[in-house]
Amino acid sequence: MANATAARTAAASATADIPILGTSITAYGVALDLDDFDGTVGGNISGTSDLADLSQQADMITEWFPEAKKVALLFCSAEPNSNYQVQEVATCLANKGIETKEFAFTDSNDVASMTQSAADYADVVYLPTDNIAASNTEAIANILVPAGVPAICGEEGICSGCGVATLSISYYDLGVTTGKMAAKILTGEADISTMPIEYTDATPKYNPTICEELGIQPLDGYEAIEG
């Protein structure tokens, strides 16, 4: 079992025969550079994904902020999974007639400058599931909140630090699902080469602290992120 993309990459480099189950991997097709990815990796790799539905994330932006005309896509250019997410969300928003612009940082050193540029441009910021963003939520919040610019986020950890709302994946449930997949392989019930990547349901959640600071009334159907 390999937790996250780096561990999955290392495991795949070490063996082509032993079954490898990845977990907390956002986009397998991107991580494995599969142009024809159809939901099943094949070979000795399968697993679970922490990706929440991207079209639903785009819908969240228009549901929470129906007057928004410009959305800044704030992400790390060095993370292929992040780039995949923002491209998909940008397409969904374009179909809604909303203008988007990418603000990509390369590492933690330019998070603040890119966030400031995003805040100057946008009505709303979108942050995908992104490792660098997750490590810099305080810096991001310190710019967006005073500027009065809300953020919709790809996962709960980022949202709890700097966002208004998210579709939250339970990493506990993701681990349980991965464990069940492992059991099927070990008992001979399933062949990893034909096992599709599995997902877990996402829960709409909001950040009560940032909503209060920005004067935003939470929408019905969203759970508060606990302190």
Predicted region positions:
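Hinge/beta->alpha junction and helix N-cap segments in small-molecule ligand-binding domains
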Residues: 48-55, 75-85, 102-111, 131, ...
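Pocket-lining segment of extracytoplasmic ligand-binding domains
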Residues: 80-149, 155
